[in-house]
Amino acid sequence: MAQKTRATAARKPRRKVNKNVTQGQAHIKSTFNNTIVSITDPSGAVLSWASAGGMGFKGSRKSTPFAAQQAAEAAAKGAQEHGMRKVDVFVKGPGSGRETAIRALQATGLEVGSIQDVTPSAHNGCRPPKRRRV
């Protein structure tokens, strides 16, 4: 059987457009298993993001406050390359890395304007997971 050759077009690597955005939003999603930090411009376009799993933490170490701190620092450094100076923080979820991620954003030099908790709460919606027996 003859080998088929596929012609693949050479892809040009997409260049990162350096936006100059001084004010934006930091969205921190902190679940029981992971913490994701996304920093956006005021319209909601993501400039930089990082997660605890992406920082090299695996398993139960992803849910630690230290992993959330590392993720927030990495996302803040990426946003500062775009000229970010001030952020409004939106926190979602019940995880352990909420406060630590906010402190890490402040420690990297971003000025925190406001902090809002946007955790969705069910009005008797889905049945919660069964209780753990250890």
From Swiss-Prot:
Keywords for the protein's UniProt record, in alphabetical order: Ribonucleoprotein, Ribosomal protein, RNA-binding, rRNA-binding
Top-level taxon of the source organism: Bacteria
rRNA-binding among keywords: yes
Pfam family of the protein (one): Ribosomal_S11
Biased composition (Basic residues): 9-18
SUPFAM superfamilies: Translational machinery components
Any one Gene Ontology molecular-function term assigned to this protein's record: structural constituent of ribosome
Region (Disordered): 1-22
Single Gene Ontology BP annotation: translation
One GO CC term, this protein: ribosome
Role: Located on the platform of the 30S subunit, it bridges several disparate RNA helices of the 16S rRNA. Forms part of the Shine-Dalgarno cleft in the 70S ribosome.
HAMAP family: Ribosomal_uS11
Family as reported in the entry's similarity comment: Belongs to the universal ribosomal protein uS11 family.
Protein name stated in the entry: Small ribosomal subunit protein uS11
Organism the protein comes from: Kocuria rhizophila (strain ATCC 9341 / DSM 348 / NBRC 103217 / DC2201)
